[in-house]
């Protein structure tokens, strides 16, 4: 198994609060990995640190054999590592299509239309709402939009932070079915 992501002894602080204490793990190519812990255990902080939104005081993070120590978050996305943040965090005043296009900032214009179709195939509901502003979507639709936006960057690793938070059980089932299908598709 090839290691695609390696997190080694990272320590993250919020001011004087030691939020992440020496966490280490590896993700192999093709693996699905879950971070499990109580509220406040540091799961979101860990994902945000890997994505370059926070910095570790010590330790290292390597993606595909390259250090991410001083790499800005937008370049981490361009390398193939995308985060779907907790709470969806879509651009509420922008349309569905505009939100998806924001996720394609790493792509050349020629491929964006094809990428949009790929996302619309995964999430047909988004195609029905492509001109609608994201703020008017349901929670489940916003989660689909956040996932679709991340997929527009062609990630090699897709990190999902609380993908089922606040969703009805039927929507949770749909989201996890899509995650399984993405895993099978590679």
Segments (PLM) and residue ranges:
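Glycine-rich phosphate-binding loops of nucleotide-dependent enzymes
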Residues: 2-186
């Amino acid at each position: 198994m090839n290691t695609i992501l390696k997190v080694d002894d990272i320590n993250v602080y919020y001011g004087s609060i030691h939020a992440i204490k020496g966490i280490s793990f590896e993700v192999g190519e093709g693996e699905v990995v879950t971070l499990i812990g109580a509220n406040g255990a540091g799961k979101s902080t860990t994902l945000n640190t890997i994505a370059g939104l926070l910095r570790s005081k010590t330790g290292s993070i390597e993606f595909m054999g390259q250090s991410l120590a001083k790499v800005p978050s937008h370049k981490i996305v361009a390398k193939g590592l995308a985060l779907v943040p907790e709470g969806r965090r879509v651009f509420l005043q922008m349309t569905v299509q505009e939100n998806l296009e924001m996720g394609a900032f790493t792509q050349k214009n020629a491929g964006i239309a094809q990428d949009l179709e790929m996302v619309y195939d995964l999430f047909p509901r988004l195609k029905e709402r492509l001109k609608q502003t994201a703020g008017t979507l349901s929670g489940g639709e916003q989660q689909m939009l956040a996932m679709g936006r991340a997929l527009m960057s062609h990630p090699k690793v897709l990190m999902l932070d609380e993908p089922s938070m606040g969703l009805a059980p039927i929507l949770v089932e749909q989201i996890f079915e899509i995650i399984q299908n993405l895993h099978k598709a590679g």
